[in-house]
Curated annotation (Swiss-Prot):
Subunit structure: Homodimer.
Species assigned in the record: Burkholderia ambifaria (strain MC40-6)
Record's GO cellular component terms: cytoplasm
The UniProt record lists the keyword Metal-binding: no
EC numbers for this chain: 5.1.3.32
Active site, per annotation: H22
Name this polypeptide is given: L-rhamnose mutarotase
Gene encoding the protein: rhaM
Catalytic function, reaction form: alpha-L-rhamnose = beta-L-rhamnose
Localization: Cytoplasm
InterPro entries, per the entry: Dimeric_a/b-barrel, L-rhamnose_mutarotase, Rham/fucose_mutarotase
Role summary: Involved in the anomeric conversion of L-rhamnose.
Phylogenetic placement of the source organism: Bacteria, Pseudomonadati, Pseudomonadota, Betaproteobacteria, Burkholderiales
Recorded superkingdom: Bacteria
Stored SUPFAM superfamilies: Dimeric alpha+beta barrel
Length: 104
């Protein structure tokens, strides 16, 4: 398993809506993420900057790169696009984070 982290940006005033939508996450999206090899997925909010920090584990043979063409994933991204920054492909704008320290 590999651990990765990335940053996204939430629109101001949307933290409760973001939380609500994730409380009601679609079962088919959960299945899609798991089938892509994603495990132990956390998203944290820095409410001073509206930055979301995601940390997840992925299997060595993950298929995260294929999520961009998955219908369920694209539908979710469209559903979330009104409350967060997105890229030209409709996916949330993401900035990979560089590991700086690890305590096993």
């Amino acid at each position: 398993m590999e651990t990765i982290a990335f940053r996204m940006v939430l629109n101001p005033g949307q933290s409760e809506e973001y939380r609500r939508r994730h409380r009601e996450i679609w079962p088919e999206l959960v299945e899609t993420l798991r089938e892509a090899g994603i495990r132990d997925y956390w998203i944290f909010l820095d409410d001073a900057t509206n930055h979301l920090f995601a940390v997840l584990k992925r299997e060595r043979d993950h298929r995260m790169d294929q999520l961009v063409t998955d219908d369920v994933m694209r539908k979710w991204w469209g559903f979330m696009s009104d409350i967060m920054a997105t890229g030209s492909d409709g996916a949330p704008a993401q900035k990979p984070l560089v590991p700086m320290f690890y305590l096993p």
